[in-house]
Amino acid sequence: MPRRDDLKKVVILGSGPIRIGQAAEFDFSGSQACRALRADGYEVVLVNSNPATIQNDPEMADRIYIEPLLPEVVKRIMELEKPDALLAGMGGQTALNIAAALAHDGSLDELGVELIGCNLTAIDEAEDRDLFKKVCEEIDLPVCKAIACDSIEQVLASVDELGGFPLLIRPAFTLGGLGGGTAYNTGELVEIASQGILHSAIGQVLIEESILGWQEHEYEVMRDGADNAIIVCTMEN
C-alpha cells in the first residue's frame, strides 16, 4: 500500500491464539506491520487476544488492547479510538472474518473507518466458496465440479448432479477447514455438511466432486503493485 497522508490512525487486528491454520507467522507479519506503520508516522492501535505474542510488546503500538477478537468488541474499541482505517490482512482468518462482518453490517461506514490492505470484495471472493468458484470460471481457470449449498436439502440434491460419492465438503469462512471433510455415503454427507453449515460464518458449504488420488502441487507467490511476481516456495502433497 502506498503512503496515505489522509490516514492518521490505524487499527491492526491480531490473530489471537496459535492454532491449526493460524500460527506464529501472523504474529510475525502483524509485528512487521506495526513497525512499518509507526516508522511511517501513523498512530497504531493493536487489538489482539493473545498476550504471549511479539506484537503485544509495548513498543510495537501506541496502544494495545488485549481483548476477545469479536466484531462487537472491535467495534467498541473503534468507537473509543476513532481510527481512520482498519488493517485485517495481518491477522489471518479470524481478523478477516471480523472485518467482513463489520463491513457487511454497516459498522465501518457508520464509524467512518476505511478497510485497507484487503478490500471487502477481495475477502468475499476468496472466502465465499461459490464466489471463488465463479471468479475462477470467469478467468478460464479449471475447477472441480461443485455446488454451493446452504441447507441439507440442497446438499442431498447435489449428489446425483456431481456424479455420486465420494464428495468433498468445504465450508466457507472457516479456519483450517473446520467443519469440512470427505463423505463416502449419505449418512456421512449429512453429518459433515451439517457441521460445515454450522461452523461457516455465512452458513454455506461447497459440495465438490472428489479427485482423490490426484497429486497436489502448491505454489506460494508474492506479487507487488507493479505486477512483479516471485515464487517463494513450492509444496507437493
Locate the predicted segments by residue:
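N-terminal beta-alpha lobe that positions the nucleotide/phosphoryl donor
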Residues: 1-237
